[in-house]
Amino acid sequence: MALIIDGRKVAAAIREEVKSEVDRLKERGIVPRLAVILVGEDPASVLYSRSIEKACTRAGVEYELFALPAGIPEDDVVALLSRLNEDGSVHGIMVELPLPKQMNRQKVLEAVSPVKDVDGVHPVNRGYIMSNSEGLFPTTPMSCIEIMLRNGIEIKGKHAVLVGRGESVGKPLVYMMLNQNATVTVCHTFTNDLAYHTRQADILVVAVGKAGMITGDMVKPGAVVVDAGINEAKDGGICGDVDFDSVARVAGAISPVPGGVGSLTTTLILKNTLKAIRLQGGKV
């Protein structure tokens, strides 16, 4: 049976680190502050904003939610972001996705200052990933890296196969894995014989949004399997892209859903907020 990679345990450790850093900043008169912009009432976004607020409260980070109506003009959202960019008391800004269909997603996201972009969605920060420079990076691919490194799983020199090339996880994770000195193969919709490629992986990361698509016969014995997918299960709960039971019998280590990658995302938003303070000229 595979080692179960416990994302909740990793998240708890990072929360303690964040809390300690927040306390040190407050001793110097710096109170970390995160602004979250929620346009409309998407249920998942509302729930996520509440989980971020809870994480902020526990860590001692100030939290401000800007809940805007779905019909608000795009220019008004951009104007709000401009004000927050100029507000020195705001260290991190996050725009909840998805935005209403009538809005230009890219225009809104590019209106966030790169040094306050705690969700790592600005093109400048995406460029920093590619160039292996210091920036603010998206939290789900960060979670994939963190849960491996903090469980003593070596990435350097390993063959990593990524299934999925989405903007939020797959594409940034390609460069994050390269920056960890892995050899990376990317599989996607048009990849022929997916199972052939997945069976070559020392590390297999899956993020496609298709429940149970990776089964035990598609995994190399002893491989590390990181499931970054999230789907609605038949019983009404959530499940990942990996068929957990069959893969756990073959893999050397596996992250579950829930309890794996997703456990870290809100905590890493706070970690990015502290990093943003440093990028803005403060010291953490």
From Swiss-Prot:
- Binding residues for NADP(+): G164, R165, G166, T189, I230
Supply the EC number(s).
1.5.1.5, 3.5.4.9
Q: What's its catalytic activity?
A: (6R)-5,10-methylene-5,6,7,8-tetrahydrofolate + NADP(+) = (6R)-5,10-methenyltetrahydrofolate + NADPH; (6R)-5,10-methenyltetrahydrofolate + H2O = (6R)-10-formyltetrahydrofolate + H(+)
Similarity remark: Belongs to the tetrahydrofolate dehydrogenase/cyclohydrolase family.
- Subunit architecture: Homodimer.
Please name the PANTHER family in this protein's record: C-1-TETRAHYDROFOLATE SYNTHASE, CYTOPLASMIC, C-1-TETRAHYDROFOLATE SYNTHASE, CYTOPLASMIC-RELATED
What's the name of the protein?
Bifunctional protein FolD
- Organism whose genome encodes this protein: Pelotomaculum thermopropionicum (strain DSM 13744 / JCM 10971 / SI)
What taxonomic ancestry is recorded?
Bacteria, Bacillati, Bacillota, Clostridia, Eubacteriales
Its encoding gene is what? folD
